[in-house]
C-alpha cells in the first residue's frame, strides 16, 4: 500500500508550504499568519522516486478552543493515519513549549517521527537547530520549504527505511528520471534518424518497463461519494451479494478487494468507502476509510468514478477526480441511478457533465442503473480499452514522427528571438503513458503549446481513458561552460577592430 506521511506542528511553521512543495500544487492556502489551515488536506506526491500520500494539518499549540480545538483534533487523527510523521518546527523561532508538548504526544503514540526544522534559509542553521535535539526524537533535518532546499534529501531519508519495512513495495523507482538520464547518453551517441538506432533505444527502454505491465490482472477501483451505489455496482458486476448494501451513506468502511474473471480476463474489483466533504467526516473510522480509498486509487489500474445522476456532479467529485488524474490512473466515468429519470432531467444532467467535465473529454461516460443492471455490461469494454491505451507500447521512431508532424502544423514559439527546437521523443514509461521530448529551450515552452502537444499525441496515438504525461528534457550543449578559443587570424582581426572603435570614440 502507498505510504502516508503526515505534516504536523505549531501554526505557521510552514506545513502547507511543504505540502505544496511535495505535491507540486498550490492546493493548500499559504499566508504569513497562523491558523489558516483548518482541516486535513490529502495530496499525492512523487519525490526522489517514492510515491506517497501526504496529509497537511492545522497547527497545534495547546491553547485551542472552538474551531481551533477541531483543528487540533484533525491533526491528532492525521497522526493516527500516518506511517511517518514529519514534525515541523520553526528554526528561527526556536524551541517553544508547544513543540515540547507535541513531541511528548508523538513519543506516547510510538509513531515513526522525524523532526524537520524549517525556515533555515539566511541563518546559521546548525546553531539554531541544536536546541531541537532536546525533544528526544533523533536527528533534526534542516529544510527551507519555501525555496525547496533539502526537501528531496528529507523524503529520501524518511521513506527509504519505510520502503525496506514494507518489502520495498512503496520504493518505486522513478521511471521518468531514469529514462531521461539514459536518453541523455543516447543523445550524443546515436542517430535518431536511423531506425536501427531507435530500435536499440526502444529495446533498452522496454526492459525497464516490461515488468510494470507484465501483470494481466486488471485492478478496478470503484470510487465516489457515499451512497452513490458503489457496492450495488460491485454486486451487480459479480452477480452476487458480495458486499453489504444499505440505503444509508457510509455502509462500506474499508476497501474490499475481490478477484473475478470475465471472458478469460482476470480482474480485481476494489469496492471503496465513499469520500465526502471533509467537514462532514465525523467518525474516526470514516476518516481511515478516506485514506483507504485514496490508497485503492493508487493501487488500481482503472478507476470507475461513480456519480449519482439525481444529485449531479459536486465539488467533492471534482476533488476526487483531480486525485485520480494526479495519480495517473485510467478513468471511466459512471453515472448511476439513470433509471426512472425523465428525458428533460437526463438532458440537464448530460449538459452539466459536458460543462463541468470538459477538461477530461478523453474519458468514456456510461449511464447505468446498478440496481437493475442496465448498461453495466458495457463498462468492461471501456475498462479494457482504457487499460490497453495506458499500457500500449510505442516506438521512439513513431513518437518522433508524431512530434515533427505536430511541429510542422504548429511551430514552437520564439523565445528571446530564438525558435524552440524539438529534436526527438521517446517513451518514458507506461500506465500512464509517459512521453519524453528532448530539445533546446524546452523548459521555456508556453503551457498552451504543451497542451497542444499533449492533445496531438493523444489524437495520433488514439489514447482513450488514460491521462498522458509529457516530460521535457533539455538537450546537452557540448559548448556550455567552455571558453571560445580564437585563432591567430581572429585575434589580429579583433585587435584591429578594437583600435578602430577607440579611434571612433575620440
From Swiss-Prot:
Disulfide partners: none
GO biological process: ribosome biogenesis
Keywords in alphabetical order: GTP-binding, Nucleotide-binding, Repeat, Ribosome biogenesis
Signal peptide positions on this chain: none
Alphabetized InterPro entries for the sequence: AAA+_ATPase, G_ENGA, GTP-bd, GTPase_Der, KH_dom-like, KH_dom-like_a/b, P-loop_NTPase, Small_GTP-bd
Span of domain EngA-type G: 3-166, 218-391
CDD domains given in the database record: EngA1, EngA2
Binding locations of GTP 1: 9-16, 56-60, 118-121
GO MF annotation list: ATP hydrolysis activity; GTP binding; ribosome binding
Binding positions (GTP 2): 224-231, 271-275, 336-339
KH-like domain location: 392-476
Purpose of the protein: GTPase that plays an essential role in the late steps of ribosome biogenesis.
Subunit description: Associates with the 50S ribosomal subunit.
Family membership: Belongs to the TRAFAC class TrmE-Era-EngA-EngB-Septin-like GTPase superfamily. EngA (Der) GTPase family.
Official protein name in the record: GTPase Der
